[in-house]
Each structure stands twice: as structure tokens, then as C-alpha cells.
């Protein structure tokens, strides 16, 4: 058995030796003080006894140690390996390691213990054994984990080979190690507060958004039928003094706890992101406030807004900016915080106005963005006219729409309203019921006047949508009922009425932008995903095939959500400052979550529910679009189908029938915990899959991957390209629609741009808001896109690797299709008047160099990482 590997045996002692390679990254490379540089000095500190490794057998058990796999002798890292090996990513270091390991006695290694005897942590990537008797190919131990000094842990750090095993198939020698590792990650006996090195995944409610001790509380979200919410990761911080149920908050500079391997462990952009958001919150916001206080504080024309991109804004150098320069690594924030002198806030030109500064104002572009904008999942097919409300009549009375056939009849290409309904050509963007219940509270906030809107569209013969009418409704108290006072506006192209119509579209955009940020983006991707991240780490071993399938789609999600709780969605945070629901925003999202349904989050189910597609066995993906040129849906179905095919092929390798799935204890515990704890406020819902069949697991995993990758990409990376020019996507409206005979109406005639701008988002809110979405719309240079993996040896299973290669190839084919459709002049919704091609669901799988960094408005990352 050992004859073929004579070179790994020292002949004299007959003692087998296994040679390995360790790849790690030192902490200070990742500290970014020497940003992007390869740090070679000091590597010697890892040699000698600094880091030790011990192999664990997968085949030979130790009866004196509970029949666990036998543990070999400690081995230390050896010489630093340089140029003879394939090139390394910046900052990676390779070391040799030699193990005394007699395969005849100890069998085949299946796991490894790594101990760090330094004072600093390091990031361990992989340990590879090249020639192991009895094993075809290399043994790769996957880590991708921070290893802290050994005295920080109550247990040994154990890493497993990259083999995939269902619990029932795990080698008996390794089963206790597998169970121990899950117990350590659950940390159910550790209350916290957790420290930086901890690896505990536990749940908590959203009780850390407010600051009760400083008189700024917020409702606790989650744990109550009145305010249900997905769970977040627990930090274990102390409660506030005023409210024992609320968790105390940290200052912005402190790191909020997330399990250590969830924190941005890779290079480049990720830490920059954290610093950028904090720089905006702590430095740029005060500077902008000072600027606005010392100038007229308003834009007067569209050119004033364009100057933000063409010239920049000179901000005063407030003390907070100086402080940040001292505290943050300069390389990271040199763009945001220039070293000295004048602070010029200069923003890149958003794509929506790059080719044509006026196109955003057209009805064609307004309608196109409903199908190919940043929130393209709201439009529904109209099935009755006039549109009805589903609000409770005992509380709201009759909220049936006031839009009549007379408003729209002349723009239906010769059809009657009934004929247009019957031929699937009437559609609605209906924000009326979504916002009406909250408007009395929301309009009580300073600087707000928001309408609840309904917008009707007609599907024209050329495949584009035309807006027919906009209904603006405000709440009106009549006795015990909140009735609606509604006005209907129709398209106009000349005089004051053209500007009235332009304002009507702006009020619609305010609704749509608030829903987009709060629901389509925050709730339906970021918040609902976190329970899946936590449950997967608590209940599925890293060796479980489903853990290997899903874990790339969780990268950085807990970290970005923690950062959001710290600076964006907290009381007084940037979100409350810039989006109209203000302090009611997160509470509103809790009301919406009451009706969240996991099985409706997949794309085909969503399209069918909205009536924009029908089931059709003859169509390629069993779904036929009623709006054929619907870029989000057309590209999305391609992506959905590719994910579904990949997931199905992968699961079939491990689950040969439904019985295997039902007998998988880890998987059943995972699904039960998602349902009963992570999304526990909805645990009684009848729609939850029972997880009795492989088809249910396929659908669930496809949906999880879809939400984390394509759905998030569709709502995130278009933020700055579409909404970076605020007149196109205002986030607030400040006053009511001008009525004939009023001073406001006169102003609209005299100085329409000024009147329009004074109605929408203020200057302060605009500058803060677009500074933020500029950061949030960027791809990092180390982005891992759908169809890519950050570790090529993520599994040893050749069947899984081959299925994944087919998935990647399919995605590259889809890239070609997207480009082809964007070049098809017959598909008018692909580019629109702004000449801005729809690329948000272009996978970018083919980009393996990180070339597409920054604001590209294309590419589907694996995970919600920004």
C-alpha cells in the first residue's frame, strides 16, 4: 500500500511522513494599514512552535478517547514556501508542514486540529496533504477561518477535509468531532456579551435600534404577534437602563459583534465599506448640516443638482472630519476624507443621466423603470376596473379608486376598458393600500406630505407601457373611519399641467422608493436571510452537503446587517433621515412582514401571483410572461432556472430518495429551527414546506439562493445608477400638489424647476442619501459572483464539481443572451429613452479578475454582502 510513496517515508525508521502545505493570511495584511501590499517580513514568527497541527484519523478510533478518531503527534509549520508554487493572492503566505503519520496504524486523516500559540490571530485558508496512501488525490482541509490564540477558546479548533457527508454517512471516527463543532457554534450555554474572537450563532429580536436611555426609543421588532420580525444574530450586550428589554447600543467606532468568521475576512472593499458608512454617518453628515445651515439650504434648479456631479460641493471642514482622518486608515477613506484643505464632495454621474439629462422626465422612462428599474417587482395586472381596495371597510370605509373610463379611454389604442382588461393590457402600480394605513402618522413628521398612489399603465402594441392616470390619495378622518380624499391626474405635455403631471409622477416615485428601500431591499432580502444564515451554522455541519451548497450565499450578510443596525436603520440613522417613513419605517416593515410568505419569494411564484405571468407547460420555464419585454422577469427566469437546475443536480447526488431526506437529522433540525425560531413569529403559517421530499428541499434552496443573489442584485446595484439623481427617484415629498388659484400653482408656472425641487427631497436629505447609495451600489474587487467560488477545492466530490461547472457555463451563456437582448432594437424596454441598458441581472460569472469593481450596474454576487 505504501510502495508508491517512498519519497514520503524515511526508510530507516519505517515511520511514515505526510507532507502538507498551509495557506494563511496574517492579521496585519487584513488590517489594511498597508493596504494591498504583500507583507513578507515577520513571517518567521509562524515557524517553530508558533502554530501546531495534529491530524485526526477518519478510519482508526481511539477506544481510550470515546472511540474518537485517533489524533497524531503535533507538527509545526516549516519554511516559508515561495516562488516554486502557483502565485498567491496578495497577502497569502504558504508554509510547509510534515506529519509523523503511520497510515497502517492511523488510517486516512479526515480532520485536523490547529493551535495558535501567538498573541495575534491569523486567517487560515487551507491545509493540503498531497500524497496520502489509500486516498485518491489530495486531502484538502478547508478552513477559511480566523484562528485566535489557543487560550481564547474552550475547545480545540478542528477543521475537516473537504468531503461531503450526510450525518448518517459520516465516518464514525469523525462523528463526535462533527457534533462537538456544531455544539460550539450554537453556544447555547454562552450568554454573552460576546467578544471579537467568539464564534457563537444565536438569535435575538430587533431590540437594539432605539436609544431609550437618551429618550429615543423604538418598538422592539420580533417576538410578538403585534410586531413580528425575522430574528437577527445575538450579541449578548447589556440591556439599557430605562428599558430592560432593549439592548444597549455601541458607539459608531466600536465593532458590533458578529460570529468571527462572518466578519469581512477578505481583503479590499469590505472593510472600506464599513469605514465609508461610518465616515458618512459621523463626518460627512455633520459637514453637510453645517453647509446647509450656512447657505440658502436648497437647490433652485436641476442644474444645481447636476453640479454635484459636474463640479462637486465644497463642504466646511468640521471637527468631526478631522477626527475621522486620525482614526481611520487613510488608504481606505482618502476619497471620502481628503487629507487636508477644502473638502469637496464630488459624486460620479449616475447612469440615468449620463447619455441624456432630460430622458428621466419622459413618460416612457417612467414606465420602463417599473419593468427594468431598481424596484421592478411591484407591477401587477389589473383584473377589475376601477381598482378596488382590500383595506378593512370597518376602519377605512370604501377606498375604491376614483379613476374612471373617461380618464383613460382615449389612450387604449382603440380598445374599450373591458377589452383592454380582457386582453391583459391594463396594469397597475398600486401603492394605495400599502401606505394609506400609515399616512396620518407619517404626515405628522416634520417636512412630510406623502400621498398614497395608484398608477395605471397600458401595454402598447410595441411592447412598452404607457402611464394612463395617477391617483393621489390622502387620509381623511370621518367619524371612526379613515376615508380617502383622492384626485386623479392624466398625462399632459404643455404648460403648467405638464409640470403638475411631472409632480404626480414624483409622488409615485416617492412611494415606490420608500417601499423599495424598506421592503423590497431591507426586509425581503437582508432581514429575511439572516435567520437562514444562523440556522445553517447552528444545525448543519460544514461537512453537510447542504451547508456546502448554501454557505457561499451567506458571505458577509450578518456583518452588513449588523452595520445597518448600527448606522443605517437605527433611531436617527441615515435611513430615518433620508426616507419618508422616518421613525415609523422599521415598524412599518414589521406590519408588512406579517404577510411574508417564503414560498412566494421565488420568481415564478411571484410573477404568477402578480398576474404578469401564467403557468404554461409549453413555455421554456413553464411560465409565460404576459408582458414579453419585461427585462427583470425575462432575465430573472433564466437565472432562476439555472439555479434550480444546479440545485436539483447537486441534491440528487446525496439524496437518492425522499426517505434519505426524512432521515437526515441535521437537515430536519435546520428546517425546524428556521421555521420555529428564525422566522418563529410566522411558525404557524400553513404555507411552510414540511420538508418531507427532496423536491421541497430543492425549492427551498433555490429560493434561498435566489433571494441572496439575484433578487438582492436586482434591488441593490441599481440604487445609485437610477436614484443617484434624486429628481428621478425622490425619497420624500414635502408639500401637497399645487391646486389652481393657489400661490404654489403660480410658482409652478413661474419657476417650475424650483417648485418641483422644493416639493421633493430636501438638499440635506439629498446629499446624505446619495452619498450613502453611492457606497452601497459598488461591487468590490474581490466580489464572488454567482457561478463562482472563492475556494476552488470547496468539495472533494467530482460529481458536485462537474454539476457546478455546468451551472457556471449556463450563467456565462445567459450573459450572452442578456447582451443580445439589450442589442435588439425591437425590445424597447431594455434601454429606454435614457439609453441605459438593463444589466442588473447580467451574472458577471465570466469576470474572474475583479475587473468590474465599483458602480457597474451589473453582476450578481453570491450573497447579500452590501
Swiss-Prot record:
Pathway: Lipid metabolism; oxylipin biosynthesis. It comes from the Eukaryota. InterPro entries: LipOase (IPR000907), LipOase_C (IPR013819), LipOase_C_sf (IPR036226), LipOase_CS (IPR020834), LipOase_Fe_BS (IPR020833), LipOase_plant (IPR001246), Lipoxy_PLAT/LH2 (IPR042057), Lipoxygenase_dom_3 (IPR027433). Residues 33-161 form the PLAT domain. Its cofactor is Fe cation. SMART domains: LH2. Keywords: Dioxygenase, Fatty acid biosynthesis, Fatty acid metabolism, Iron, Lipid biosynthesis, Lipid metabolism, Metal-binding, Oxidoreductase, Oxylipin biosynthesis. SUPFAM superfamilies: Lipase/lipooxygenase domain (PLAT/LH2 domain) (SSF49723), Lipoxigenase (SSF48484). GO terms for biological process: fatty acid biosynthetic process; lipid oxidation; oxylipin biosynthetic process. Gene3D superfamilies: 3.10.450.60, Lipoxygenase-1, Domain 2, Lipoxygenase-1, Domain 3, Lipoxygenase-1, Domain 5, PLAT/LH2 domain. Its EC number is 1.13.11.58. Pfam families: Lipoxygenase (PF00305), PLAT (PF01477). Residues 164-866 form the Lipoxygenase domain. Binds 1 Fe cation per subunit. Iron is tightly bound. Fe cation binds at residues 521, 526, 712, 716, 866. Residues 206-250 are annotated as: Disordered. It catalyses: (9Z,12Z)-octadecadienoate + O2 = (9S)-hydroperoxy-(10E,12Z)-octadecadienoate. GO terms for molecular function: linoleate 9S-lipoxygenase activity; metal ion binding; oxidoreductase activity, acting on single donors with incorporation of molecular oxygen, incorporation of two atoms of oxygen. Plant lipoxygenase may be involved in a number of diverse aspects of plant physiology including growth and development, pest resistance, and senescence or responses to wounding. Catalyzes the hydroperoxidation of lipids containing a cis,cis-1,4-pentadiene structure. Belongs to the lipoxygenase family. This is Putative linoleate 9S-lipoxygenase 3. It comes from Oryza sativa subsp. japonica (Rice).
Amino acid at each position: 500500500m505504501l510502495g508508491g510513496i517512498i519519497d514520503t517515508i524515511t526508510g530507516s525508521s519505517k515511520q511514515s511522513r505526510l507532507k502538507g502545505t498551509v495557506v494563511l493570511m496574517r492579521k496585519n495584511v487584513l488590517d489594511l494599514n498597508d493596504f494591498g501590499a504583500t507583507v513578507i517580513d515577520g513571517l518567521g514568527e509562524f515557524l517553530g512552535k508558533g502554530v501546531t497541527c495534529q491530524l485526526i484519523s477518519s478510519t482508526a478510533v481511539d477506544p481510550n478517547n470515546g472511540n474518537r478518531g485517533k489524533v497524531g503527534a503535533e507538527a509545526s509549520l516549516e519554511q516559508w514556501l515561495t516562488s516554486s508554487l502557483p502565485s498567491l493572492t496578495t497577502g497569502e503566505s504558504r508554509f510547509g508542514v510534515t506529519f509523523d503519520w503511520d497510515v497502517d496504524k492511523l488510517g486516512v486523516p479526515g480532520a485536523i486540529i490547529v493551535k495558535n500559540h501567538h498573541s495575534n490571530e491569523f486567517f487560515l485558508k487551507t491545509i493540503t496533504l498531497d500524497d496520502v496512501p489509500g486516498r485518491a488525490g489530495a486531502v484538502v482541509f478547508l478552513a477559511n477561518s480566523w484562528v485566535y490564540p489557543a487560550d481564547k477558546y474552550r475547545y480545540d479548533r478542528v477543521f475537516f477535509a473537504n468531503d461531503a457527508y450526510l450525518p448518517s454517512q459520516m465516518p464514525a471516527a469523525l462523528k463526535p468531532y462533527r457534533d462537538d463543532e456544531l455544539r460550539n457554534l450554537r453556544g447555547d450555554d454562552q450568554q454573552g456579551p460576546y467578544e471579537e474572537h467568539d464564534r457563537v450563532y444565536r438569535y435575538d429580536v430587533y431590540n437594539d435600534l432605539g436609544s431609550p436611555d437618551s429618550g429615543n426609543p423604538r418598538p422592539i421588532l420580533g417576538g410578538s404577534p403585534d410586531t413580528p420580525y425575522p430574528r437577527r444574530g445575538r450579541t449578548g450586550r447589556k440591556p439599557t437602563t430605562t428599558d430592560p428589554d432593549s439592548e444597549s447600543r455601541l458607539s459608531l467606532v466600536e465593532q458590533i459583534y458578529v460570529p468571527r468568521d462572518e466578519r469581512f475576512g477578505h481583503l479590499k472593499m469590505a472593510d472600506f465599506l464599513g469605514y465609508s458608512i461610518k465616515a458618512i454617518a459621523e463626518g460627512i453628515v455633520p459637514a453637510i448640516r453645517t453647509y446647509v445651515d450656512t447657505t440658502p439650504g436648497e437647490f433652485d434648479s436641476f442644474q444645481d443638482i447636476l453640479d454635484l456631479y459636474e463640479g462637486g460641493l465644497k463642504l466646511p471642514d468640521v471637527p468631526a472630519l478631522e477626527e475621522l482622518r486620525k482614526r481611520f486608515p487613510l488608504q481606505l477613506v482618502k476619497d471620502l476624507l481628503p487629507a487636508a484643505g477644502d473638502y469637496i464632495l464630488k459624486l460620479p454621474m449616475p447612469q440615468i443621466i449620463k447619455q441624456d439629462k432630460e430622458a428621466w422626465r419622459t413618460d416612457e422612462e417612467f414606465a420602463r423603470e417599473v419593468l427594468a428599474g431598481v424596484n421592478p417587482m411591484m407591477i401587477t395586472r389589473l383584473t377589475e376596473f376601477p381598482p378596488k381596495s382590500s383595506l378593512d371597510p370597518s376602519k377605512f370605509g370604501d377606498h375604491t379608486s376614483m379613476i374612471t373610463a373617461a380618464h383613460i379611454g382615449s389612450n387604449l389604442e382603440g380598445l374599450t376598458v373591458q377589452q383592454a382588461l380582457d386582453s391583459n393590457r391594463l396594469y397597475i402600480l398600486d401603492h394605495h393600500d400599502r401606505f394609506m394605513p400609515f399616512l396620518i402618522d407619517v404626515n405628522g413628521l416634520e417636512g412630510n406630505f406623502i400621498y398614497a398612489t395608484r398608477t395605471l399603465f397600458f401595454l402598447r402594441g410595441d411592447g412598452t407601457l404607457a402611464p394612463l392616470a395617477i391617483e393621489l390619495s390622502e387620509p381623511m378622518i370621518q367619524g371612526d373611519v379613515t376615508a380617502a380624499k383622492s384626485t386623479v391626474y392624466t398625462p399632459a405635455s404643455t404648460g403648467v399641467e405638464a409640470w403638475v403631471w411631472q409632480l404626480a409622477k414624483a409622488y409615485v416615485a416617492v412611494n415606490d422608493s420608500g417601499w423599495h428601500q424598506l421592503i423590497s431591499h431591507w426586509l425581503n432580502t437582508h432581514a429575511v436571510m439572516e435567520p437562514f444564515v444562523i440556522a445553517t451554522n447552528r444545525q448543519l455541519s460544514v461537512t453537510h452537503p447542504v451547508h456546502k451548497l448554501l454557505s457561499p450565499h451567506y458571505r458577509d450578510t450578518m456583518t452588513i446587517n449588523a452595520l445597518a443596525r448600527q448606522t443605517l436603520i437605527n433611531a436617527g440613522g441615515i435611513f430615518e433621515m433620508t426616507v419618508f417613513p422616518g421613525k415609523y419605517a422599521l415598524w412599518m416593515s414589521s406590519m408588512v412582514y406579517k404577510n411574508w410568505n417564503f414560498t412566494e419569494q421565488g420568481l415564478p411564484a411571484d410573477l404568477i401571483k402578480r398576474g404578469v405571468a401564467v403557468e404554461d407547460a409549453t413555455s421554456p420555464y413553464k411560465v409565460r410572461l404576459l408582458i414579453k419585454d419585461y427585462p427583470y422577469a425575462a432575465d430573472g427566469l433564466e437565472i432562476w432556472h439555472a439555479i434550480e437546475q444546479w440545485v436539483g443536480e447537486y441534491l440528487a447526488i446525496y439524496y437518492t430518495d425522499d426517505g434519505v431526506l426524512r432521515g437526515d437529522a441535521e437537515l430536519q433540525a435546520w428546517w425546524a429551527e428556521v421555521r420555529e425560531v428564525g422566522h418563529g413569529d410566522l411558525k404557524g403559517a400553513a404555507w411552510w414546506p414540511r420538508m418531507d421530499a427532496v423536491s421541497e428541499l430543492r425549492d427551498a434552496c433555490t429560493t434561498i439562493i435566489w433571494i441572496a443573489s439575484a433578487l438582492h442584485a436586482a434591488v441593490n446595484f441599481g440604487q445609485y445608477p437610477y436614484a443617484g439623481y434624486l429628481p428621478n427617484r425622490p425619497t420624500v415629498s414635502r408639500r401637497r400638489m399645487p391646486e389652481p388659484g393657489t400661490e404654489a400653482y403660480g410658482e409652478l408656472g413661474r419657476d417650475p424647476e424650483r417648485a418641483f425641487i422644493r416639493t421633493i427631497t430636501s438638499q440635506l436629505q439629498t446629499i446624505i442619501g446619495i452619498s450613502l447609495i453611492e457606497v452601497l451600489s459598488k461591487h468590490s474587487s474581490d466580489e464572488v459572483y454567482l457561478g463562482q467560488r472563492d475556494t476552488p477545492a470547496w468539495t472533494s466530490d467530482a460529481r458536485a464539481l462537474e454539476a457546478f461547472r455546468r451551472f457556471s457555463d449556463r450563467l456565462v451563456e445567459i450573459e450572452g443572451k442578456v447582451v443580445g437582448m439589450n442589442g435588439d432594437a425591437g425590445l424597447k424596454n431594455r434601454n429606454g429613452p435614457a439609453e441605459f441598458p438593463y444589466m442588473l441581472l447580467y451574472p458577471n460569472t465570466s469576470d474572474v479578475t475583479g475587473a468590474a469593481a465599483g458602480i457597474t450596474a451589473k453582476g450578481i454576487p453570491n450573497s447579500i454582502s452590501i
